[in-house]
Every structure is written in C-alpha cells, then in structure tokens.
Amino acid sequence: MNKKVIIKNIGLIDYKEAWDYQESLFDEIVSIKDRNRKAEVQEESYNYLIFCEHPHVYTIGKSGKLENLLISEDFLKSKGATLHKINRGGDITYHGPGQIVGYPILDLDNFGVSIKNYIDGLEEVIIRALQHYDIIATRSAGATGVWLDADDPIKARKISAIGVRTSHWVSMHGFAFNINTNLDYFGYIVPCGIQGKSVTSLEKELGRKIDIEEVHQILKKEFSNVFDMEFVMK
C-alpha cells in the first residue's frame, strides 16, 4: 500500500479554483486505479493533502437546504461572499480567511480504512491538534465534526466541520478548522443544518491570535500519526 502523500499549502485561493484543482487530482488517482485493474504492471499513484484558505464563501452539500442560508443573495454579495452548491456530503458551511481548509485527496485503499473510519480519522486529527493547545475536544453523537463541550446543550460549540465525497474509494473535500476566523459570518447560516448550536475558533478559545503556520505543522504531524502517512515532495 502506497502511503506516500504530497502535501501542499496553497494559501488564499478562490473556492472554485481550489475545487477544480481537487477534481483534477481526484480524477488523476481514479484514472490510475482504473488502468491498474487491467494492467500486469501496477502504476503508482500519489495521495495529496492540500491546505488552503478561501475568501468569504458558503458551500452547500448534496443534502443541504437553501433555507439554511438566512440572508438573501444580494445581502450575501454585499458582505463580499459567494455561494456554491457542491458534491460533498453535509449541509451548509462557511469558509473564509483565518480558517484552515484541508483537502485530503487519498486513495483510501492505500490506508485500509472504511469511509466511516476515514471520517473518524479526520476528526481524530483535529482532536489531537487541539490537545497541543490544552483544549479538550470530542465528537458529538449524531453529528460530524469536532466539538467543545459536546455533551452540554448550552455550551456545545463546533470548532471544525467535516464534509467529504468518495468515489472509487478515493476521497476529496475534507475539513474546515476555525483558527482566526471571523465568526460573524456563521450568523448568516444554520451551520451544517444544526439548529441551536454555536461555533467557535481557536483564537476565541485562547483569547489571542494564532500562528496559522504553527497549526499547519501540528496538523501535518497528526495526519502522519493517525493515518501513518509518509510525506514526500514533488
């Protein structure tokens, strides 16, 4: 199994441009897998882990409902935001500057995980990353993502959202981890379609600005620990 992963930090990038880039890497891996089914000599495919940030944007997954966007499209535009309906699982979420978005484009056959275990693994990466800041985070029953005080109906707040797409056992999309995020933008939606729950950020929890590059390095370490990845340059 090839657990080599090419990691790229592409910085601030338009959502559609990043989506197209994901699709190209996804299609590359699927094509190699298809060729390998018929070939005597197996061709090696790479896995990818992309870190980036986006300008203000809302995305709605396949099961999402437009009524969970609480503002008109005109008001949305006045806030400098865009809206995209996309092919991941889940409902509506927000991406913006100060938020780390991670797109693992992986051949899951290489990692020996089910789709459920893969999503659990993404959550585990974030949970472990938060431990570096002495923050205890957990999963929440019946909801994806990473939460603080998940069992307290009043205090429960989400710090990382997760939504993925898989086909041919290849993954795309991934997670959004609130670091220095402007949380006001979450007030214009019902985040992930879950009523009555709030969101938070690492900055809000610690009361200070966070070095995003430091978080990148922590995430890289925990991806390696959780998925036994070997990072390579290309």
What spans do the regions from the language model cover?
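N-terminal lobe of the biotin/lipoate ligase/transferase fold
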Residues: 1-156, 210, 232
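Glycine/proline-rich loop-helix segments at beta-alpha junctions forming the active-site rim
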Residues: 157, 176, 181-184, 190-192
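Histidine/acidic-rich helix-loop-helix segments that form or flank divalent-metal centers
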Residues: 159-162
